[in-house]
Design a protein with these regions (language model features):
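A glycine- and small-aliphatic-rich helix-loop capping segment at beta-alpha/alpha-beta transitions
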Residues: 32-35, 91-101, 123-125, 146-155
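Active-site-proximal alpha-helical scaffold in enzymes
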Residues: 106-133, 172
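Conserved beta-ketoacyl condensing-enzyme motif
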Residues: 16, 50-108, 225-238
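Short, well-ordered amphipathic alpha-helical segments that serve as non-catalytic structural scaffolds
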Residues: 54-70, 118, 203-218
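Solvent-exposed alpha-helices and their adjacent loops that cap or buttress functional pockets
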Residues: 5-10, 72, 94-97, 111, ...
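Short beta-strand segments
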Residues: 17, 81-82, 131-137
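Condensing-enzyme catalytic core mediating Claisen C-C bond formation in acyl metabolism
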Residues: 1-51, 148-214, 218
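Oxyanion-binding "anion nests"
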Residues: 205-233, 237
């Protein structure tokens, strides 16, 4: 592992060994529905409340990622990840029965990629052979607390995007596999001074652009270095 430029790191032997994605019923109907490993037909995920449903989503994703390569939680050095609830309550409850070390990440939309970046650093530093990452959200837990708190009293327009119900897990390892993780760039806080609380896309876009710019500078590469650049945003363009 070598530090590059101001904000980046280059890995020597880090791989995505396994992954799993579990979704709710609405997500199954979307354009990515066929790619989920499993989708519930009930937003309660056969539990009694929204929080228990999200806990179940996390457990399913983690256990399936492990099952795909024949591992158990005892084979995992540490779990890195989080959710959108206060004090990362969902992830803490999901992991409490598995007796595994845990590093919490509370980073909104970047929780998934930040967890993978941190796990990659831990693997390449020699801390562990297999590190599990987990990220989740549930429309009915996050929207009432994280994005539209009940006490805030805000009205959500029909044109707004909807927080996903689902969980994704990945096992980052130094054991070679088909997908190698080679680079990571840590972003900075960029405040565009926008006041429209309904437009999260334009609020996030400047930080994404600056991170991409820094990535290219740190590694002294051009855009054509990559076949595809994917960016997720909280906005729908018409």
């Amino acid at each position: 592992m070598i530090a590059r430029g101001k904000s980046s790191v280059e890995f020597s032997k880090v791989f995505l060994r396994s992954s799993a994605a579990i979704s709710g019923p609405k997500e199954k109907k979307g354009p990515l529905g066929e790619f989920f490993d499993y989708s519930y037909d009930d937003p309660y995920c056969r539990t009694e409340n929204w929080e228990q449903a999200e806990i179940q989503l996390q457990k399913d994703a983690m256990q399936l990622a492990l099952k795909k390569i024949g591992l158990e939680f005892t084979d995992i050095r540490v779990v890195v990840g989080g959710d959108l609830n206060n004090q990362l309550a969902i992830t803490n409850y999901a992991l409490r029965d598995f007796d595994v070390p845990y590093l919490g990440v509370y980073s909104a939309c970047s929780t998934c990629t930040q967890s993978i970046a941190l796990a990659s650093m831990l693997v390449d530093s020699g801390y562990g052979e297999n590190i599990l990452t987990i990220t989740s959200s549930h429309n009915s837990t996050s929207e009432r607390q994280f994005r539209y708190p009940t006490e805030y009293g805000g009205q959500k327009p029909n044109s707004m995007t909807s927080t996903a119900t689902g969980a994704g897990a990945a096992i980052i390892s130094n054991i070679p596999s088909a997908i190698k993780i080679t680079r990571a760039t840590i972003g900075k806080i960029v405040d565009p001074n926008l006041s429209d609380t309904q437009d999260m896309g334009r609020t996030m876009a400047p930080a994404a652009a600056m991170t991409l710019k820094q990535h290219l500078e740190d590694f002294q590469i051009e855009l054509d270095e990559y076949d595809l650049m994917a960016y997720s945003k909280l906005r729908i363009d018409f």
